[in-house]
């Protein structure tokens, strides 16, 4: 019997990190979980909504554990595999670590062409290999909607763990990739994006945060998270709350992918953006006349987005230069950390 040949994006209701449960609903669910007892070796757990868990094994080594998976946002199965793997590996880099082993998480309809699944797995394998980790197995579920990602284990020195809870007043805030992926993925699904812009979006999503994180070996950064489904302002809010600070974002310095503003002006906006805005906006003050489309994109759910880094002001410019030399060519200073004020975030 001939297998189905539907496009990947035709088999999903939402793609990439835009398919995540919204932050407000998720926070409500997680608030019902019991707290872990005071476990001395659990360095990072549930409390600060961080990117991964970190468990101290001994004085020299801690284990980083994370997983991530989502539905397709592109039709090319190999590229989808690359994007999903890059996104999954990112959490390890955000914690200051090195990925060691990864395992596939696969949901795929058995009625569909299995060569498509093979291409997805090849894309994931190649990105894991690029990261320096090993792909060692996985688990599958027969599901009408395809989903793919990785469970990743990494290591880090216990005294070099990076967190979203350690931003300091006086720090500068750096982003390592431009935003607007969610808006443009939505437009791409409708065939509304020029090919050179679509190629740029894919290039951004498959780029490993490994290259930006290489600079952490030379520069002492204070706090890091990665920007994914909750958007720039959503993950900035997590950092501000966890660190008990406020953060100022200079909107004119935030890098936005070509075409994203135009699509947002036309109302091409993923549902995840509205979920993010509903949850986060009460903690945000907007100062000045900032275009509505730009404000919207600050809430845009990113798929395999960049790192958000808080670092001492005197190190910020040199850190950006170093990251660019390592391949994070669009790294940019976008704001500052200030003492806790009335609002957690001010957009200027």
From Swiss-Prot:
GO terms for molecular function: ATP binding; magnesium ion binding; selenide, water dikinase activity. It is an enzyme of class 2 (transferase). Belongs to the selenophosphate synthase 1 family. Class I subfamily. ATP binds at residues 20, 48-50, 68, 91, 138-140. It catalyses: hydrogenselenide + ATP + H2O = selenophosphate + AMP + phosphate + 2 H(+). The active site is at 17. Its EC number is 2.7.9.3. SUPFAM superfamilies: PurM C-terminal domain-like (SSF56042), PurM N-terminal domain-like (SSF55326). Keywords: ATP-binding, Kinase, Magnesium, Metal-binding, Nucleotide-binding, Selenium, Selenocysteine, Transferase. This is Selenide, water dikinase. Homodimer. It comes from Clostridioides difficile (strain 630) (Peptoclostridium difficile). InterPro entries: PurM-like_C_dom (IPR010918), PurM-like_C_sf (IPR036676), PurM-like_N (IPR016188), PurM-like_N_sf (IPR036921), SelD_I (IPR023061), SPS/SelD (IPR004536). PANTHER family: INACTIVE SELENIDE, WATER DIKINASE-LIKE PROTEIN-RELATED (PTHR10256:SF0), SELENIDE, WATER DIKINASE (PTHR10256).
